[in-house]
UniProtKB/Swiss-Prot annotation:
GO cellular component term of the entry, any: extracellular region
Name of this protein: Basic phospholipase A2 homolog BnSP-7
GO MF annotation: an example: phospholipid binding
Marked site (Hydrophobic membrane-disruption site (MDiS)) residue numbers: L111, F114
One Pfam family in the UniProt entry: Phospholip_A2_1
Tissue: Expressed by the venom gland.
Self-association and partners: Homodimer; non-covalently linked (probable alternative/compact dimer conformation in solution).
Record function comment: Snake venom phospholipase A2 (PLA2) that lacks enzymatic activity. Is myotoxic and displays edema-inducing activity. Displays bactericidal activity and promotes the blockage of the neuromuscular contraction of the chick biventer cervicis muscle. Also disrupts artificial membranes, and provokes tissue damages characterized by edema, necrosis and inflammation. May act as pro-inflammatory mediators, inducing metalloproteinase and cytokine production from the inflammatory and satellite cells.
Native organism: Bothrops pauloensis (Neuwied's lancehead)
Subcellular location: Secreted
Keywords: Antibiotic, Antimicrobial, Disulfide bond, Myotoxin, Neurotoxin, Secreted, Toxin
Regulation: Heparin inhibits the neuromuscular effect, myotoxin activity and edema-inducing effects. Bromophenacyl bromide (BPB) inhibits the neuromuscular effect, the myotoxin activity and edema-inducing effects.
Length: 121
């Protein structure tokens, strides 16, 4: 769910997920879509593509379990869809951490109408 995703992003990046990524670039946030603006925005694009592959669960609502061991996210689910959902969220959180150097405040509240159509997943 969005709750676990936000928690993972906070743990990995140290940033407030809603404030820092809720409307970042063309792809971060609920309404995001379009050609990525930078590596940070590309993380969100790849995350949306990961969600599109899920069948049998709702990425925004369905809760899953994970643990934070030695600064590492460990997904722990028996349900295959929830396990994949957790892995999608884990991947974006790690990607955002790895690309903290590309984070650009000018894209924090980027207006989505200015986004060009992105390549399909």
């Amino acid at each position: 769910s969005l709750f676990e995703l936000g928690k993972m992003i906070l743990q990995e990046t140290g940033k407030n997920p809603a404030k820092s990524y809720g409307a970042y670039g063309c792809n971060c946030g609920v309404l995001g879509r379009g050609q990525p603006k930078d590596a940070t925005d590309r993380c969100c694009y790849v995350h949306k593509c990961c969600y599109k592959k899920l069948t049998g669960c709702d990425p925004k609502k369905d809760r899953y379990s994970y643990s934070w061991k030695d600064k590492t996210i460990v997904c722990g689910e028996n349900n295959p869809c929830l396990k994949e959902l957790c892995e999608c969220d884990k991947a974006v959180a790690i990607c955002l951490r790895e690309n903290l150097g590309t984070y650009n405040k000018k894209y924090r509240y980027h207006l989505k109408p200015f986004c060009k159509k992105a390549d399909p997943c």
